[in-house]
Amino acid sequence: MSKNLLEQLREVTVVVADTGDIQAIEKFKPQDATTNPSLITAAAQMPEYQGIVDQTLLQAKKDAGDGATQAQIVSLAFDRLAVAFGLKILQIIPGRVSTEVDARLSYDTEATLTKARDLIAQYKAAGIGRDRVLIKIASTWEGIRAAEILEKEGIHCNLTLLFGLHQAIACAEAGVTLISPFVGRILDWYKKDTGRDSYPATEDPGVLSVTKIYNYYKKFGYKTEVMGASFRNLGEITELAGSDLLTISPSLLAELQSTVAELPRKLDPAKAASLSIEKISIDKASYDKMHAADRMATDKLDEGIKGFTKALEDLEKLLADRLVRLEGEVVASH
C-alpha cells in the first residue's frame, strides 16, 4: 500500500502543527506546535475554547487584586492566555510548543528579554521545563540580540518573521535554537510585485529562499534548526521535504494526509556540504545594509509586525469585552 505525503514527509522532516486549535492538534498528532498572536486570537474566538479564555480572565482578576482596573486585568490575562493555550497543547504533543513575545516589543531588546523570561516563569510554575518551550521573537536586529542572551540563559528561541539570508545568518551566529523562514508570505510579495498569478513550486521565491538558508546552515555546520513556515500550497511543502522541521496549517496537513504520491527528499545536508557557497559574517552595519537592500524582507518584516500587533489589539479588545460580560454574570448571579 502506497504511503500518503504526510507519512513520507514525517520520515525526513519533523512535522509541526501551525495552529492554536487544540482539536486540530489532537487529530494530526504533530511532534511540535507553533502559535502566534493571530492564531491565539482566532482560537480565543472559537466557542470550544471559551472556557480557557474565561478561566484565564477570572484568575487574572483574582490575582490583580481588588483595586485593579479593567486594563490591568486584561493586560495580565493577555500575557497568560498564550501560555494557557500552550499548556493545553503540551498535554497532547510529545515535543515543544512555540509561544510568541508581544510583537510590539520587536525593536526593544530589554523589553523582549523581560517578557520572554516571564513566559518561561509561567511555564515553570505549571511544571513545564525549558526544553519543551520555544520563545518566538521577530527577527529584527534587536530581537536577535535578545535571543542571543536568552539562549545563554538556557531559554530556547524560535526566530520568526524571517524573510532574508541576512536575518538567518545573524540568527545562526547568535546561536539561536531554531528559525522560522516564511515561504508563502515571500510568494505573496513577489506575486504582487511582478503581477504574476502563480509560480511553479520549483521557482517559488519562498521555496528558493528557504532552500538557500538551509544549504547555508548545513554547509557551514550551524546547529540552528530550519523550520519552514507560512505555506500557501502543497507544492511549497513538497519542495522543502528534508528541512529540519516544517510547520503546517491544519488544512494543508489534511491535504498532505489525503494525497498518495511519491515524495522525493529535496533538502539534504550531504548535498548542501558539496555546494560552493561564500561564508559571510553579519554585524549591525551589514545587517542594516542588507536589510535595506532587500525590499521584500523590509516590507514583509514591517507588515508582519504590524499584522501581529493588530491581532494583539483585537485580542485585548476581545478580553476586555469578555471581562465585562463575565463581571455582569457574577453580579446577576448574586
Swiss-Prot record:
Location (main, coarse): cytoplasm
InterPro entries according to UniProt: Aldolase_TIM, TAL/FSA, Transaldolase_1, Transaldolase_AS
Keywords per UniProt: Cytoplasm, Pentose shunt, Schiff base, Transferase
Catalytic reaction annotation: D-sedoheptulose 7-phosphate + D-glyceraldehyde 3-phosphate = D-erythrose 4-phosphate + beta-D-fructose 6-phosphate
Protein name: Transaldolase
Similarity comment: Belongs to the transaldolase family. Type 1 subfamily.
Gene Ontology terms: biological process: carbohydrate metabolic process; pentose-phosphate shunt
